[in-house]
Amino acid sequence: MSNYEDLRGAAANEEIILDDQGIPSVMVKVPLVYLDELGIGSAHTPHPAFIINDKVVPYIYVSKYINVIKNNRAYSIPNQDPANCITFDRAVEVCYNKGAGWHLMTAAEWGVLHNLITAHGLEPRGNTNNGRHHVKTYEHGVLSPQNPTNVYRTLTGTGGKAWEALGVCDIMGDVHKWVVARLVDGEIQIIPNNNAAIHKTDLGANSKAWKAILQDGSLVAPGTNGTLKFDYTGNPANATSGFHITTTVEHKQTDDGAGYGAKDFGTLTAKSGVTIPDILKALALFPNTDKTGRGFIYFRNNGERLLFRGGSCGNGGLAGEANGTFYNPRSISLVSVGLFSAYVDPALYA
């Protein structure tokens, strides 16, 4: 990887950024944007992806390509079999291993990408049907020679411009991407603003960094009365669309065999009388002006459930940059789950 320019694509917002060992990743620069500019509320407030350690940063960097892991570090480089069979904790580790500023993509960072895609009227496509797009089947990437039987991952960035949005390739499909957010017994929990970008932030199951969300958007200790939660509207069942955002779990499932919730993200609603704060829309955990057909959202409300997003090569019309899966534990390791790393210069929030 000595000729770094060979890694670059054509997008003007791409930059090559080196880790603390001088190894490059192709990154996409995302400038500061405000919530009102994205159609979220009326306040001219920075999107939370640009607030770190109570400082407003002028830009962030996200991976252009689904990452590959080399020497226990995550890299954004083209023409690679995407990293897969990786747990949440391992995904966090291989990003932190790159040095200060490097981290697993956060809920805030995915959220700003989703909302920018919406604001620009983009409709990204990707590998959603065994190496091809499920509708435009003439669009395809290069199948990975490392695929096991009946797995159809494509090499990073080989799907062409139609599989790119805002300079980011494969945000839809190929493999799901771990993102820093979770449910605990249905309660939505995040790391405030973009503080998960701070090096070695504790993202463990028992970390005090996790916060729950009230209806007014304030962040509080998990378990506080009245926080926002995913809950079924009746008895849990497999792939039921009967669920909403509420403040009290009334239909908690007792085990995974009780099923899971699944519906188009654009149809997600709140229980009558529950107010959805702008922060959920900013993080793409609740639709703002979203159309349907941009991905499904899934959940279970028993135990800790970490988030991955985007869909995979077998998800068809269920994939999309709005796709979000809250039904697996942090220990899950699948051939269809990988990651994006991200980077923010620590000098910007020191």
What feature does the model see in each segment?
Residues 1-15:
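Charged, compositionally biased non-catalytic regions
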Residues 45-170, 201, 253-256:
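Short aromatic-cysteine micro-motif
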Residues 1-2, 143-149, 154-155, 162-165, ...:
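C-terminal, surface-exposed recognition/capping segments
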Residues 10, 21-22, 28-38, 63-65, ...:
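Structured loops at beta-to-helix junctions and adjacent beta-edge loops in soluble globular domains
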Residues 11-21, 129-134, 292-301:
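Short low-complexity stretches enriched in small and charged residues
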Residues 118-123, 183, 192-195:
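Short secondary-structure boundary/capping segments
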Residues 15-101, 186-250, 305:
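Extracellular adhesion/carbohydrate-recognition regions
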Residues 70-71, 111-114, 177, 185-188, ...:
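Short catalytic/ligand-binding loop motif for oxyanion handling, primarily in non-cytosolic enzymes
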